[in-house]
Amino acid sequence: MGMKRLTACCVFGILVTSAVAQEGIVDLTDLANYANQPIPAYITRDNTPGNNPITDIGATLGRVLFYDKRLSKNDTVSCSSCHQQEHAFTDQDIASTGVAGTTGRHSMRLINPRFSSERKFFWDERATSVEDQSTKPIQDHVEMGFSGADGDPTLANLITKLSAIEEYQVLFTGVYGSPVITEQRMQRALAQFVRSIQSFDSKYDTGRATAVSDAAAFSNFTAEENAGKQLFLAPPGGPGGGGVGCAGCHRAPEFDIDPNSGNNGVVGSLGGGMDFTNTRSPSLRDLVDASGSPHTGFMHDASLSTLLDVVNHYNTIPAVVTGLDPRLQRPPGQPQRLNLSQPEKDSLVAFLNTLTGVSVYTDTKWSDPFNIINALSLIVLPLDTDALSFSGVGVAREVTVTSVGVPNVAYIFQTSTDMITWTSTASTASVAGELTMTVSAPESDPQCFYRYAYIPVE
């Protein structure tokens, strides 16, 4: 539903933007920029499907769904419970706590999930896309509990649950033009929000923006960081001894995973035993926070505590195991031995630290939209360009304001001359979902601003 903002509402949106996260306001007339964020020219990989491009309004709905604990069977767990913005959208705990215990793998970071040629998701790549991935945790017995097994309700039960919540009827109408909630609509909105999470303001990006290539020395890097970059990029055994070959699997400048990668030799399982199925890695961006501290342990089992531990693992792969990536083996069928010196290890760690950004941890468009009591306080409806219709002249002039609502649901119609103080009038959508209000608008009066809004039922 391609709604455009009316000028009358634009200024109001600017007024409340800074308070959105604190006050629980979702303003569909003044949307955060999800769809047209700046992307460096050197970033070229993109797994966004043609039938689900990121839109500001779709990602806004996705943000609400991502943070809403009502998507779990007992209202205690949301997507954000395991993917926390302040920790690069991963979990500080090794195993995340769901509605029925703890997860079998560590929570994967959600940084730059869009910017990869690998479309599959989860550590074991069992989801075919971000869309497919987005509702699988909801349908997991341990994570969010709508599995339809072991006495759990089904996803259909969740859809029934959400469909009975008026604020979701309002939001889905604002985004899709009707209050109907389906798994596909949820998947599309969640995927748009997740794909919008991007981080391109790191020290690496500052250097790459003025360099002719990744291989060139970056002017803002230290000698150690540039040395680490070269080790990362160059394959083993090349000129001058070569490098480490990290980029063979983790490809610069996106630092996404090569879709043809096997497992990396870390085959432990949080539940005990061995797990050879983990072939997917998140982007290597934002491995650590701005201070260089890990968000938590690395790998699917969080078994490596520091970046140096990670480097040591690849320096000496423990054994050739089932599914080990061939690039981590040496003939004849032996595990990789890089024989790195300590200064070389330190330079690799220094380089990996340069991949951490800044804004992704604090930007409010990726933050919790609910207020302090985990509720939304106001939803401002989108208005089409023909929503205002004037009739009459002079003191007899009137304006009719229309919008699309949920049939028979109560809204408020608001007017303001300063976008600070609003006068509200009750307005109920018709059986057909039409919202219509006609008010006096004398030409001699100051400019007036109009909007429809919905106050969620507690």
Feature locations, PLM:
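Bacterial N-terminal signal peptides that target proteins for export
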Residues: 1-9
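Periplasmic c-type cytochrome electron-transfer domains
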Residues: 2, 21-383, 433-439, 458
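Bacterial N-terminal signal peptides
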Residues: 8-18
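General secretory precursor processing signal
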Residues: 12-13, 82, 249, 451
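Short, composition-biased motifs enriched in small/polar/acidic residues
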Residues: 379-458
